[in-house]
């Protein structure tokens, strides 16, 4: 399996709440059915807010997390798929090209957002060790 991971940054003119609400409700609604129709394994979002960065990291690491170690992206979005061809079908679909892709201008920072792709391994799922 493979994963396409987006280190997302909100547009400068959006609040954290506006950004997280938009990607969770509007943008994901454009994309979910298309992903499912093309055998995509999973589509997940991790929402990183100033509260989670400050409060939760501080609680988990008891104030021992150096500030320079904290990456301040607003969200991490991950699409997991079995073959690259599965994901290419999504990107080549007319709905992706006319609705999903153009929607990025409504929320994504055009220069800060970053992308990575690699193979995907699952070691624990549903509270059970996966071998």
Curated annotation (Swiss-Prot):
Tell me which Gene3D superfamilies the record gives. Answer: 3.30.70.100
The keyword Nucleotide-binding is assigned to this record: no
Signal peptide segment: none
Can you give the residue ranges of the EthD domain?
A: 13-109
Metabolic or biological pathway: Secondary metabolite biosynthesis
Which InterPro entries has this protein been placed in? Dimeric_a/b-barrel, EthD_dom
Query: What protein does this entry describe?
Result: Dehydratase phnD
Keyword Coiled coil recorded: no
Name of encoding gene: phnD
- Tell me what organism the protein belongs to: Penicillium herquei
User: What does the record give as EC number?
Assistant: 1.-.-.-
Q: Which GO terms describe its molecular function?
A: monooxygenase activity
């Amino acid at each position: 399996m493979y994963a396409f991971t987006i280190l997302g940054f909100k547009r400068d003119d959006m609040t954290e709440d506006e950004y997280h609400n938009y990607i969770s409700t509007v943008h994901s609604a454009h994309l979910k059915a298309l992903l499912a129709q093309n055998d995509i394994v999973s589509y997940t979002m991790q929402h990183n807010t100033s509260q989670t960065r400050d409060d939760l990291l501080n609680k988990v690491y008891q104030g021992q997390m150096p500030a320079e170690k904290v990456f301040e992206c607003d969200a991490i979005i991950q699409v997991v798929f079995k073959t690259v061809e599965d994901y290419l079908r999504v990107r080549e679909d007319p709905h992706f090209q006319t609705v999903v892709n153009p929607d990025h201008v409504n929320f994504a920072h055009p220069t800060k957002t970053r992308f990575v792709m690699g193979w995907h391994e699952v070691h624990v799922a549903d509270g059970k060790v996966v071998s």
